[in-house]
Amino acid sequence: MLAKRIIPCLDVRDGQVVKGVQFRNHEIIGDIVPLAKRYAEEGADELVFYDITASSDGRVVDKSWVSRVAEVIDIPFCVAGGIKSLEDAAKILSFGADKISINSPALADPTLITRLADRFGVQCIVVGIDTWYDAETGKYHVNQYTGDESRTRVTQWETLDWVEEVQKRGAGEIVLNMMNQDGVRNGYDLDQLKKVREVCHVPLIASGGAGTMEHFLEAFRDADVDGALAASVFHKQIINISELKAYLASQGVEIRIC
């Protein structure tokens, strides 16, 4: 059995790490490189960086900090933000990123997933999915351009259909960003995760809602996700990564101990 992964998420805007609630009202958390270094030292299994306004601004992720992060950490990291071409991806990987993640650009051009997978291998192609639960219809819908709330739009894709589509096109991993839970620390949406797990045959990462160590345990035990991503509980030092891993190990979760 592969070890489960604990993944801090760093949302980047204007060269700094920020955090919002339900993808809105972002506050500045701190500088990118020191935070990355801290999380690596605390025992994170990998890091994910989202340049949250790159796609909505029509630009690619700011590469200047990618190489600086690569210099100070010795764990894998993934970078996302406006990657719309093989050339964009090649540059980011050449600066030291281990994986690239695409989200809004994949919705605009699904063939991008296949082209990236063919060029670089499925192992480094992650597809992020921003999913919103509509209580009126009882359905999960995929949103696009979520880094800028004024430009966010609901797509025609229902979440489960898009999960299946991106796998057919070559996604090597899926990060499910559950927008309703984002930043509120009430726990992951286990019902949604279980439904996605049934149709997801590549590594699945849960994102949005972690507030306690028990929430991580529930995601691993009840929804069988491969990794759990979180931001505010780590940024605000509500949960220490090494203590979280010790707790999960004590509960029988296969985890890499620091």
Curated annotation (Swiss-Prot):
GO biological process: L-histidine biosynthetic process
Catalytic activity reported: 5-[(5-phospho-1-deoxy-D-ribulos-1-ylimino)methylamino]-1-(5-phospho-beta-D-ribosyl)imidazole-4-carboxamide + L-glutamine = D-erythro-1-(imidazol-4-yl)glycerol 3-phosphate + 5-amino-1-(5-phospho-beta-D-ribosyl)imidazole-4-carboxamide + L-glutamate + H(+)
EC number: 4.3.2.10
InterPro entries for the chain: Aldolase_TIM (IPR013785), His_biosynth (IPR006062), HisF (IPR004651), IGPS_HisA/HisF (IPR050064), RibuloseP-bd_barrel (IPR011060)
Pathway: Amino-acid biosynthesis; L-histidine biosynthesis; L-histidine from 5-phospho-alpha-D-ribose 1-diphosphate: step 5/9
Keyword Cytoplasm annotated: yes
Transmembrane segments: none
Localisation per UniProt entry: Cytoplasm
Cellular compartments per GO CC: cytoplasm
Pfam families reported for this sequence: His_biosynth
Oligomeric form and interacting partners: Heterodimer of HisH and HisF.
Matches recorded under HAMAP family: HisF
Homology family: Belongs to the HisA/HisF family.
Function: IGPS catalyzes the conversion of PRFAR and glutamine to IGP, AICAR and glutamate. The HisF subunit catalyzes the cyclization activity that produces IGP and AICAR from PRFAR using the ammonia provided by the HisH subunit.
Family annotation (NCBIfam families): hisF
Name of the protein in question: Imidazole glycerol phosphate synthase subunit HisF
Classification of source organism: Bacteria, Pseudomonadati, Pseudomonadota, Gammaproteobacteria, Enterobacterales
